[in-house]
């Protein structure tokens, strides 16, 4: 006879979950509160590929970036320093994002930003890598840990023109690889 294990029931999340992506908001790096309802009708490798994707569809695609310091503490700068670091260090070379960057936020754990609570509820795992949570447990710097947690920087979510979460992509998927799905969603938009 083996010992039986009982799993503790997951704690109820105290984060209010929005009914629609367009009910959400966040604060930009410039300190302005952005109501996501302004993106209604639009479809949302990194920084340079995100710029390229945004440039290809300037009127109908909206790229939103949310810096986070939960993955190996790689974003340890302040909100005020982020744009300067992007311009001069990473990726550098005078880089300026042509998409909206929001203030740093938590994407996992008890203080998960409502945007990510909503997205993870509707898309609990990346479509291209549904079984991996994280390859380096020593970098788990949040609690509670959930199966739907974002695994690393540059995990991406594509939201349709009516605000419905469409697909979630692992960090291994380059933004350029999202283009067929972006085109598919743009065809649905009227």
Regions inferred by a protein language model and the residue ranges of each:
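Alpha-helical solenoid scaffolds in eukaryotic macromolecular assemblies
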Residues: 26, 31, 36, 41, ...
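Short, hydrophobic alpha-helical segments
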Residues: 123, 185-190
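Thiol/selenol-based redox catalytic cores and closely related redox-interacting motifs
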Residues: 88-173
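Extracytoplasmic/secreted proteins, especially bacterial periplasmic and envelope-associated proteins
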Residues: 49-52, 77, 81, 110-114, ...
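Conserved helix-turn-beta segment immediately C-terminal to the redox Cys motif
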Residues: 40-66, 87-92
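A short acidic/small-residue loop/turn micro-motif
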Residues: 41, 171-175, 180, 186
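Thiol-based oxidoreductase modules, predominantly thioredoxin-like and allied folds used
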Residues: 58-79, 94-109
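N-terminal "domain-start" segment that seeds a small globular fold
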Residues: 5-37, 125-126
């Amino acid at each position: 006879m083996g010992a039986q294990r009982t799993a503790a029931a997951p704690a109820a999340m105290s984060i209010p979950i929005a009914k629609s992506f367009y009910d959400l908001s966040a604060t930009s790096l410039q300190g302005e509160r952005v109501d996501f309802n302004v993106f209604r009708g639009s479809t949302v490798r990194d920084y340079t590929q995100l710029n390229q994707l945004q440039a290809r569809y300037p009127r109908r695609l909206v790229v939103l970036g949310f810096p986070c310091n939960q993955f190996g503490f790689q974003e340890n700068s302040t909100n005020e320093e982020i744009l300067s670091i992007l311009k001069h260090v990473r990726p550098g070379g005078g880089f300026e994002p042509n998409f909206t960057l929001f203030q740093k936020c938590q994407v996992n754990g008890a203080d998960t930003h409502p945007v990510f609570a909503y997205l993870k509820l509707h898309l609990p795992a990346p479509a291209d890598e549904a079984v991996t949570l994280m390859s380096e447990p020593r970098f788990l710097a949040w609690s509670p840990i959930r199966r739907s947690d974002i695994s690393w920087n540059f995990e991406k979510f594509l939201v349709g023109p009516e605000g419905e979460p469409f697909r979630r992509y692992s960090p291994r998927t380059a933004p350029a690889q999202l283009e067929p799905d972006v085109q598919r969603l743009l065809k649905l938009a009227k």
